[in-house]
Design a protein with these regions (language model features):
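Transmembrane alpha-helix interface/packing and boundary motifs in multi-pass membrane proteins
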Residues: 74-86, 196-202, 260-267, 298-308, ...
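Helix-loop-helix hairpins and the membrane-proximal interhelical loops
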Residues: 2-62, 174-177, 208-292, 433-437
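Helix-coil boundary and interhelical linker segments in multi-pass alpha-helical membrane proteins
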Residues: 51-63, 101-112, 251-254, 354, ...
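Membrane-embedded alpha-helical modules
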Residues: 106-216, 220, 224, 334-445
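Residue-level signature of catalytic and energy-coupling elements of molecular machines
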Residues: 32, 52, 136, 205, ...
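Juxtamembrane transmembrane-helix boundary signature
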Residues: 2, 71-92, 122
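Loop-to-helix transition at the N-terminal end of transmembrane alpha-helices
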Residues: 56-76
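Helix-loop-helix junctions within the multi-pass membrane cores of secondary transporters/permeases
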Residues: 11-45, 49, 70, 91-149, ...
Length: 445
């Protein structure tokens, strides 16, 4: 009994030394509960990400495993090196951009697309090393940042509606309503409303519950075939190490690479600031302890993710759910990472999830991201016009890159045209000029 007590005390002492629990006003029990809470809110990514990357021709079961691995790697690294209650996983939005635009629309092999993700992550790492990252965040206006986030939300929402069959291609009107009497369409719609209703009632696992319910209904209707629940981890060699660095390192993909870098920069940095602020760890300027380590972990995780066959990795805003129940240290993130490792043994479940079960999650994420448009000053046309152009051009041009490009250019046009040149930061001017050069010298040929 004494030995057991000594072992327990030793374990608690180690946790105290590594995570400084008392200093942060928390306990190991609270951190574990927070980890479980965060995990339940974001575990949907292991089912949705393979569905999306499968569109690019990637092995969905292998992607399921690599999604678990990179989520575990990034989250555990964030916990151990930055001691923050922030979990990481492949970014929703950039995975859709990779699959539907870079691979499907542009016709590039997925290996080349992974190369573009790699170079974008390297760019992000260099911005972090040379401390340019926060300079860019501070100097790019809120309207453009909101426009980018909302545009990706509209793009994801459109992909969700398409995957559910709610909208279909129409040569005369571009899109039209699908067959709303089809059971697959109805299940996709049901899945979305399950998420929306449960989320509005503050149920953290809303997305996971929706995927489980719609998959079970699909099984009852004969769309899903039961393949078991637990198995040894399948091989991931069909996707690991297949990144094409040489094929992706060309001027024609400069816009795509820049888009991966810029979106990840805003997404991850914004989430880190938001979650640490909610945890009471950030100051009035948005800076938080071990910020440098957190930014390095974020960048390195994306580089690693491209090598093992998954899309850009980012900090997850769902981490705020763990913070809301008391998570304050990296122990929360480590618990999330360990749970993702356990999920690897549930790979048969990934093969059972039908496309319409994941569609509801896409539409819901689209709603969350598009809601940021409320932050735009709609009374100031020099701010609202660029935000609107950025947001709507992403789904209408079927390209996140073009939406970002037209947003930056239109921002400069509006400020110059109204004589408000002082509102233009060097960062915005440089980015706009880069996109103009891309349009003139690359896109025109």
């Amino acid at each position: 009994m004494s030995q057991q007590h000594t072992t327990q005390a030793s374990g608690q002492g180690m946790l105290e030394r590594v995570f400084k629990l008392r200093e942060h006003g928390t306990t190991a029990r609270t951190e574990v509960i927070a980890g479980f809470t965060t995990f339940l809110t974001m575990v949907y990514i292991v089912f949705v990400n393979p569905q999306i990357l499968g569109v690019a021709g990637m092995d969905t079961i292998a992607v399921f495993v690599t999604t678990c691995l990179i989520a575990a790697f990034g989250s555990i690294m964030m916990g151990l090196f930055a001691n923050l209650p922030v979990a990481l996983a492949p970014a929703m939005g950039l995975n859709a951009f990779f699959a539907f635009v870079v691979v499907q629309a542009m016709g590039l092999p997925w290996q080349v697309g992974m190369g573009a993700i790699f170079w974008g992550a390297i760019g992000l790492l260099l911005l972090t090393i040379f401390r340019v990252r926060y300079w860019m965040i501070a100097n790019i206006p809120v309207s453009l940042r909101v426009g980018i986030t909302s545009g990706i939300g509209l793009f994801i929402g459109m992909m969700g509606l398409k995957n559910a069959g709610v909208i279909v291609a129409n040569p005369e009107t571009l899109v039209s309503i699908g067959n709303l009497t089809s059971h697959s369409v109805l299940l996709g719609i049901l899945g979305f409303f399950i998420i929306a209703i449960l989320a509005s009632r503050n149920i953290h696992a809303a997305v996971l519950v929706s995927i489980v319910v719609t998959t079970l209904l699909g099984w009852m209707l004969g769309d899903v075939h039961y393949n078991g629940i637990v198995s040894a981890p399948p091989s991931v060699m069909t996707v690991v190490g297949h990144v094409d660095l040489a094929g992706s390192f060309n001027l024609g993909l400069a816009g795509v690479i820049f888009s991966f870098m810029l979106v990840n920069l805003f997404d991850s940095s914004g989430t880190l600031i938001g979650v640490t602020d909610k945890a009471g760890l950030a100051d009035e300027k948005g800076k938080f302890p071990r910020m440098k380590q957190a930014l390095y972990v974020d960048s390195i995780s994306s580089v690693t993710g491209s090598f093992i066959g998954t899309s850009s990795v980012t900090a997850y805003i769902e981490s705020s759910s763990g913070v809301s129940v008391g998570g304050r240290t990296g122990l929360t993130a480590v618990v999330v990472g360990l749970l993702f490792l356990l999920v690897i043994f549930l790979s048969p479940l990934a093969g059972m999830v039908p496309g319409y079960a994941a569609a509801g999650a896409l539409i819901y994420v689209g709603v969350l991201m598009t809601s940021s448009l409320a932050r735009v000053n709609w009374q100031d046309l020099t701010e609202s016009v660029p935000a609107f152009i950025t947001a709507v051009m992403m789904p209408f041009s079927f390209s996140i890159t073009e939406g970002i490009a037209l947003g930056f250019i239109s921002y400069c046009v509006m400020k110059i045209g109204t004589g408000r040149l002082r509102d233009l930061s060097p960062c915005v001017i440089i980015v706009a000029l880069m996109f103009i050069l891309k349009i003139v010298f690359i896109d025109a040929h």
